Structures are given as structure tokens and as C-alpha cells.
């Protein structure tokens, strides 16, 4: 392989489950780029040396997944404002000077998926109010993304109040913590409900939330994509609500990284989505 051949990676531990090589491999083929995108299984103890060695590795950068996102945040030479706000990095870019920039593309990826699924006017259609369930890393990205898109109020509900408060604080003046028991009272004023928990994922119990108090024009999004149709989304469709599955977030968050490493800005197309859906089904 030529030294000039662009190379990127996804690093995690474990990593065999990652669909990122399928996504980036598809785009490399579409754009006729003779590059590579590789899975790298790096345990936590070896991750600092891995990052420090990137400038001499031949890689232009790569994606970072569980359990390394917080470590990547600490090890990057520079951080985008979004990554700094979220406190985690999922994208590394090695600059011409060898300095490593850390970014978080989960926030714009989530919002780009909403644009694609609901139309660009979804913040106005939501009445400027969203309710985010969960307070983990995905919730942090979603809350920051929603605040960036101009929502006036983003409620964060979690069974542990302190965690909800910490995530809500990422969006000063916009975010606010909500006690889990207060969900029924908050739903009538919610234009967008987002599940960022693992509830509903294959092997996990379903998320038990009664959607009947939601307005008739509300939208429900779930970041879970295995299965694509969670019990939450099925319940939303039965009520006639707009339902947004989690696969699009995975696809759209990959766009900025590909552009940084390989040049062209790729498109998320039905063909790409169908390819990943088929892989999930297999």
C-alpha cells in the first residue's frame, strides 16, 4: 500500500461489532478513493500509547468508540468547542503538523438525522421543547446538539437526579433536569421525545413510558438501532406520531470524519442505509 494512500480507523475494545467499516468502505467505493478504513481493537491500557503514536502511524485519523471516548478527550492536542462541551471525543484528526484534533460528531449527526427524517423545520415544529431520557454519553451529545439548533428548553430525565442535572448543565439557560416520576406531567408540553438509554435494545427490557400525553404533532426519536423498530417507536407509530429510529444518527455522525480524512463530503443515501440494515439483519 502506498504511503500516500489515505487511511483511517475505528478504535474500541471490543470492536468486531462496529458497522463503521461498512459505512466508510461504501463511501470510499462511491468516490473511487483507494483508501482504507480499519477496525482496531485496542485495550484501555494501550490506548494512550496508541494515540501518541498516531502522527507517525500513517493514519489521517479515525473514529473512537466504547470505552475510549473520554480518554480520547483527555489525550487530544486540541478540541473543538463541541467536544469540549460534551466532554467526550468520537473523532480524531491528525493535522499536517502532527497535532491531533478531537471532535464529537454525535451531536450534529443526531440533528442531521432529524433534518433528514422530519425536515429542517423540526425545532419549530417541536415548539422549541424537547425531553431527553437518560444521562449517559449519548444524552450529553444529544442535549448539546439540541441546544445548538436553538431549542428553548431541553428537559433531561434520569432516575439519578444528580446525573440529570449534570447533563442539563451542558446547555446553560436551555437545559433543565426533570425527575423521572414527573414525566407524565412534562409530556403534554413536549414536542420531541428522545430516548438515549439502552432500554429497548436487543437483550434489554423495553422502555416503559406512556406516550398518550404527548401532543398529536410530537415526534419520538430513539438512538437504539438494534432493533430498528423498538417498542417505543412502535408505540409512537400506533399513536400516529412521527417516529425516528437510531440508525440515521450512526450514519450521519460518520459524515464529518470521512470528509476530514478523505476529502469529499459523503451523502447518506437509501442505498447505504439498506446496506447497513441488511447487515444488521444478517
Swiss-Prot record:
Gene Ontology cellular-component terms for this entry are: cytosol
What EC number is given for this enzyme?
Answer: 1.1.1.25
Gene3D superfamilies for the chain: Leucine Dehydrogenase, chain A, domain 1, NAD(P)-binding Rossmann-like Domain
Q: Does the keyword S-adenosyl-L-methionine apply?
A: no
Identify the InterPro entries for this entry. Answer: Aminoacid_DH-like_N_sf (IPR046346), NAD(P)-bd_dom_sf (IPR036291), Shikimate_DH (IPR011342), Shikimate_DH-bd_N (IPR013708), Shikimate_DH_fam (IPR022893), Shikm_DH/Glu-tRNA_Rdtase (IPR006151)
Which residues participate in shikimate binding? 18-20, 65, 90, 106, 225
Q: Which GO terms describe its molecular function?
A: NADP binding; shikimate 3-dehydrogenase (NADP+) activity
| Summary of the function given for this chain in its UniProt record | Involved in the biosynthesis of the chorismate, which leads to the biosynthesis of aromatic amino acids. Catalyzes the reversible NADPH linked reduction of 3-dehydroshikimate (DHSA) to yield shikimate (SA).
Q: How does it assemble?
A: Homodimer.
UniProt-listed PANTHER family: BIFUNCTIONAL 3-DEHYDROQUINATE DEHYDRATASE_SHIKIMATE DEHYDROGENASE, CHLOROPLASTIC (PTHR21089:SF1), SHIKIMATE DEHYDROGENASE (PTHR21089)
Q: What protein is this chain from? A: Shikimate dehydrogenase (NADP(+))
Question: Origin organism of this chain?
Answer: Methylobacterium radiotolerans (strain ATCC 27329 / DSM 1819 / JCM 2831 / NBRC 15690 / NCIMB 10815 / 0-1)
